[in-house]
């Protein structure tokens, strides 16, 4: 009996396929056709049509499933269904993993439903290391605008790299390759996370860190070029995502401390394929809005406590410089480990806005390459706090 979908959908499916392409969606009627058509071209070209495209939908009101089913996917079969469980990306992706297990698939490719830059060769890049026996899990490696992926840049990338010892540039990138071994690992844990934030936006970080901890092969990064999608203004609409992603990340860090505390060095996760040289689309960032949200949020007592000795400086400058951000984040982790209070993660949000404001001002005259160096150099400051964190957890 499946947890995340109605077993009736299995009746019309093939008994076995080599690859499953999963597209989680919610109100993505405008973009899903392009993603599924491109995925089909990739399956035809690189898997000789031996695959299926799966649209796991969250009850879209704009006809997403219907648009998907009308799309010409050549000789590649497809299925669309409403997943079961908490509404969220995680429930959708776990339903695809369950389905892939039923179809004895050798690999899953996950693609975001709002992608505008996906190409057929992405299917090969995200599965190549798996099919060649090099890896059980492949993350995307994109060329991104310096203001795209702020939760990744300021929290997930430096924390995962410094604590878990693998520098994975896009641990929550959304477009992944998953091999058989990890399918089994995820399904073993699926019922225990079905009612948590993993069922929402916590899924990507949960999958990535589980792959680091539970696979005896390296996590690979697939060079995919630019990620062009419906970008989000950090100050406007990332607050729920921040709480779900960072809450999940904190849970995993606390629960798996015995596994990561002995990891000493940081290795760059290998990149598969040549990195295409592509110009990225500009993204607008409203720095004044971020500063306003920082000051507004600092009226909250918990946020003030997290800012601690730095409160006066932060209020005056209306931003959170890197060293202060690292101190705040690690102190929050230590505090969180005591009783896993989700309010604490929520209290980080305004300070995160202040961190993004500082980064945006610092890099405003930099090109993408220069800003990328700033992001990568942050890891050293995070790594310097690791011993202190181990002592106090």
Swiss-Prot record:
- Keyword match Magnesium: yes
Checking Pfam families in the record gives:
Glycos_transf_2
Q: Which reaction does it catalyse?
A: ADP-alpha-D-glucose + (R)-glycerate = (2R)-2-O-(alpha-D-glucopyranosyl)-glycerate + ADP + H(+)
pH behavior is given as: Optimum pH is 7.0 (at 60 degrees Celsius).
Q: How is its activity regulated?
A: Inhibited by EDTA and Zn(2+).
This entry's Gene Ontology molecular function terms read:
glycosyltransferase activity
Query: Would I find Lyase among this entry's keywords?
Result: no
Give the E.C. number(s). 2.4.1.268
Source species, domain of life: Bacteria
Instruction: Indicate the temperature dependence noted in the record.
Output: Optimum temperature is 70-75 degrees Celsius.
Record's keyword terms, sorted: Glycosyltransferase, Magnesium, Transferase
Q: Which cofactor does it need?
A: Mg(2+)
What does the similarity note say? Answer: Belongs to the glycosyltransferase 2 family.
Its biological purpose is as follows: Involved in the biosynthesis of the compatible solute mannosylglucosylglycerate through a nonphosphorylating pathway. Catalyzes the synthesis of glucosylglycerate (GG) from ADP-glucose and D-glycerate. Can also use UDP-glucose, with lower efficiency.
Oligomeric form and interacting partners: Homotetramer in solution.
What's the protein called, per UniProt?
Glucosylglycerate synthase
Q: What species does this protein belong to?
A: Petrotoga mobilis (strain DSM 10674 / SJ95)
> Which gene is the coding source of this polypeptide chain?
ggs
């Amino acid at each position: 009996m499946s947890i995340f979908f109605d077993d009736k959908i299995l009746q019309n499916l093939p008994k076995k396929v080599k690859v499953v392409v999963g597209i989680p969606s919610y109100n993505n009627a405008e973009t899903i056709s392009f993603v599924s058509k491109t995925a089909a071209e990739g399956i035809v070209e690189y898997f000789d049509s031996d695959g299926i495209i799966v649209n796991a939908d969250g009850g879209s009101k704009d006809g997403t499933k219907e648009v998907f089913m009308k799309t010409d996917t050549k000789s590649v079969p497809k299925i669309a269904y409403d997943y079961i469980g908490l509404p969220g990306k995680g429930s959708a992706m776990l339903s695809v993993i369950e389905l892939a297990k039923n179809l004895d698939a050798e690999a899953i490719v996950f693609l975001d439903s709002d992608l505008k830059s996906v190409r057929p060769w992405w299917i090969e890049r995200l599965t190549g290391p798996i099919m060649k026996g090099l890896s059980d899990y492949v993350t995307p490696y994109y060329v991104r605008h310096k203001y795209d992926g702020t939760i990744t840049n300021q929290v997930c990338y430096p924390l995962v790299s410094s604590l878990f010892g693998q520098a994975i540039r896009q641990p929550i990138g959304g477009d992944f390759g998953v091999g058989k071994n990890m399918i089994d690992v995820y399904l073993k844990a699926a019922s225990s996370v079905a009612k948590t934030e993993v069922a929402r936006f916590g899924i990507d970080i949960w999958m990535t860190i589980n792959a680091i901890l539970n696979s005896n092969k390296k996590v690979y990064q697939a060079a995919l070029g630019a990620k062009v999608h419906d970008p989000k203004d950090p100050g406007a609409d990332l607050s729920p995502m921040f709480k779900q992603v960072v809450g999940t990340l904190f849970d995993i860090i606390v629960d798996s401390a015995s596994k990561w505390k002995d990891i000493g060095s940081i290795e760059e996760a290998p990149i598969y394929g040549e990195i295409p040289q592509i110009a990225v689309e500009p993204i607008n960032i409203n720095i004044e809005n971020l500063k306003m949200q920082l000051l507004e949020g600092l009226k909250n007592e918990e946020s003030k406590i997290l800012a601690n000795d730095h409160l006066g400086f932060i209020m005056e400058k209306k931003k959170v410089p890197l060293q202060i951000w690292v101190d705040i984040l690690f102190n929050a982790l230590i505090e969180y480990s005591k009783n896993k209070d989700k309010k604490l993660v929520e209290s980080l949000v305004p300070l995160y806005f202040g961190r993004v404001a500082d980064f945006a001002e610092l890099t405003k005259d930099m090109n993408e390459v220069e800003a990328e160096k700033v992001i990568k150099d942050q890891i050293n400051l995070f790594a310097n706090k690791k011993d202190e964190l181990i002592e106090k957890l």
